[in-house]
Regions:
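Phosphate/NTP-binding elements of NTP-utilizing enzymes
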Residues: 2-232
Length: 232
């Protein structure tokens, strides 16, 4: 007869057969997860299956919506290093490109990704620093089958163990000239005061083989000319 308290409350040591089988199953699941969503996997599958978002107004948390246009945008991001996308708030486009840049940094060593907005932001709820906070949110809400990945986070900065970084920058040519990036996400470009100068300063990113993605609500000026290929 089992002793009182035996069974459900028993703690198995790491060498117990049940614990070893559980560890082996977890390792197998992690390998499958990385094969499907990791460096050699599909970034759209990662967004569709693994990414949760948070509405910055209501605080509602939900899975990223699986719209056909979102997959198309990810495919365009994979194919074209220079991308300009008009958006509406309901399209959740900024979250989409935060997610694919997170995927790039998480699974590709020594990637340097920049999130740029009109202002850097003094807190993690403002400007481009808020975009980095979204990447941290995605990181914290991945499925449990992903291997543990300890990141370094501060306002406007996210660093991965593989040497990759996501950094927040405000608009401006001086900010852009200081670095060459693997990928840049430029958000709400229609409302930047120095959009053209920043764009020119980011040319080395494209010429060096990096990606530059500009997204914005519709508006006149530089972004409209960029979308319609009328910069001259």
């Amino acid at each position: 007869m089992p002793e009182p308290g035996a069974g459900a409350g028993r703690v198995l040591g790491p060498d117990h057969p049940l614990a070893m089988r559980a560890a082996a199953r977890l390792l197998l699941e992690q390998r499958k997860t990385l094969a499907t969503y990791g460096q050699d996997g599909d970034p759209w599958a990662f967004v569709r299956d693994c990414v949760w978002t948070r509405d910055e107004v209501s605080g509602r948390v939900r899975r990223y919506p699986s719209h056909a246009y979102a997959e198309l945008l990810v495919r365009r991001w994979q194919e074209h290093p220079l991308l300009a996308i008009p958006k509406s708030r309901r399209m959740v486009v900024t979250w989409l490109f935060v997610a694919v840049n997170y995927w790039l940094a998480r699974f590709h060593a020594n990637a340097k990704c920049a999130f740029m907005a009109r202002k850097l932001g003094k807190t993690e709820t403002e400007g481009s620093a808020e975009l980095v906070r979204r990447a941290k949110f995605i990181h914290e809400h991945l499925p449990a089958t992903f291997p543990v990945c300890e990141v370094e986070y501060s306002i406007g900065f996210l660093r991965f163990p593989n040497g990759s970084e996501i950094v927040a920058l405000g608009e401006g040519e001086e900010q852009a000239r200081q670095h060459t990036f693997t990928s840049v996400l430029a958000d709400e470009v229609s409302f930047w005061d120095h959009a053209y100068e920043t764009w020119i300063a980011l040319r080395p990113t494209i010429e060096g083989g990096g990606r530059l993605t500009a997204v914005s609500s519709a508006g006149p000026g530089f972004f409209k000319d960029l979308v319609h290929d009328q910069l001259g």
